[in-house]
Amino acid sequence: MWKSILAIALGAALGALLRWFLGLKLNSLLPSIPPGTLLANLVGGYVIGAAIAYFAQAPGIAPEWRLLIITGFCGGLTTFSTFSAEVVSLLQEGRLGWAAGAIATHVSGSLLMTLLGLFSMNWMLGK
């Protein structure tokens, strides 16, 4: 149990630090759709797709690795709450087009990146 908790905690800390860094460095570049938040969600989508494909092909790997990468790192990196707050802020400002664009970009982009992660990992593994 402690190994699982440690794996999740370590992964979450690393993911959250990366998300914080991306926001710090990028969000001021385009405040309407903060690129740090978007990049965190897109990278997280790719990583989780690649990880799912990899772990499906390597069932003998210790489950703590899956917890570290998928539950911890991707959970700490991706951010539905920040994305939601940014969209609500746009709606409150009456910027409906920007809000719709942010929703479309985050959701479709994250789904496409997850698929890309799955396909690219399967390709690298020769599957």
Curated annotation (Swiss-Prot):
Subcellular location: Cell inner membrane
Residues engaged in binding Na(+): 75, 78
GO molecular function: fluoride channel activity; fluoride transmembrane transporter activity; metal ion binding
Keyword Membrane applies: yes
Keyword Transmembrane helix belongs to the record: yes
Segments passing through the bilayer: 4-24, 36-56, 68-88, 99-119
Membrane topology category: Multi-pass membrane protein
Example of a GO cellular component annotation carried by this entry: plasma membrane
Annotated control of activity: Na(+) is not transported, but it plays an essential structural role and its presence is essential for fluoride channel function.
GO biological process entries: cellular detoxification of fluoride; fluoride transmembrane transport
Keywords: Cell inner membrane, Cell membrane, Ion channel, Ion transport, Membrane, Metal-binding, Sodium, Transmembrane, Transmembrane helix, Transport
Catalytic activity: fluoride(in) = fluoride(out)
Family of the protein in this entry: Belongs to the fluoride channel Fluc/FEX (TC 1.A.43) family.
Protein function: Fluoride-specific ion channel. Important for reducing fluoride concentration in the cell, thus reducing its toxicity.
Name recorded for this polypeptide: Fluoride-specific ion channel FluC
Originating species: Pseudomonas aeruginosa (strain ATCC 15692 / DSM 22644 / CIP 104116 / JCM 14847 / LMG 12228 / 1C / PRS 101 / PAO1)
Gene that specifies this protein: fluC
